[in-house]
């Protein structure tokens, strides 16, 4: 692939795909988004037209099985991440996956072990580390400016992607509980915890 672009398939035609993932891939001249997949075919079609993506489909397994796809980008509802990631890893694909990979540590570790066995690259959607302010704080820690940290306290608040003209409720009352995030900790808490690990050190597995 030295002389060709990475061919990317995006699974999920939602807000993160629209405002972050697809624009990010398309800004990188080394990459090409070649297919967008969503259970709602008409939504995938709309995204394909909006972003000039050659193909759209509702068949995620067909996409994962394609030999001409290098990277699978998973930005679907949290409850679907593990199955999609696992199948992608089994197919030998590189993965960018929104957090969390799975709903429990055991499945997350299994996925990491499979990725290592397959020799593929994986990345979680923890973008806060790349914020200039967060990186500056890390530099201050590395330089010893604040001494040795022992406790990390944090809170997170933002209103990104919220339409001020619409109600704040993001989940329909009749939504399947198994298909939504279990808590705010899973959604916005996860990257804040990741920053803490990066700043002051994470847990060491023995």
What would you call each of these model-derived segments?
Residues 51-114:
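Beta-loop-alpha module in the N-terminal Rossmann-like domain of NAD(P)-dependent dehydrogenases
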Residues 28, 51, 66-67, 131, ...:
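Acidic-histidine catalytic/liganding microenvironments
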């Amino acid at each position: 692939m030295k002389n060709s672009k990475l061919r990317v398939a995006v699974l999920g035609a939602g807000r993160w795909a629209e405002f972050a993932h697809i624009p990010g891939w398309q800004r990188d001249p080394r990459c090409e988004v070649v297919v967008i997949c969503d259970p709602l075919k008409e939504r995938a079609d709309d995204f394909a037209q909006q972003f000039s993506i050659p193909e759209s489909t509702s068949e995620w397994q067909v996409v994962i099985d394609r030999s001409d796809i290098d990277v699978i980008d998973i930005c679907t509802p949290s409850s679907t991440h593990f199955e999609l990631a696992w199948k992608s890893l089994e197919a030998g694909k590189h993965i960018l996956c929104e957090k969390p990979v799975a709903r429990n540590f055991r499945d997350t570790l299994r996925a990491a072990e499979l990725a290592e066995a397959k020799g593929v690259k994986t990345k979680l959607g923890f973008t806060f580390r790349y914020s200039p302010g967060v990186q500056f704080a890390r530099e201050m820690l590395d330089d010893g400016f604040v001494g040795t940290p022992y406790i990390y306290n944090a809170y997170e608040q933002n209103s990104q992607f919220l339409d001020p003209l619409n109600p704040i409720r993001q989940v329909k009352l009749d939504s399947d509980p198994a298909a939504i995030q279990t808590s705010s900790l899973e959604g916005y808490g996860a990257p804040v915890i990741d920053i803490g690990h990066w700043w002051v050190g994470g847990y060491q597995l023995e």
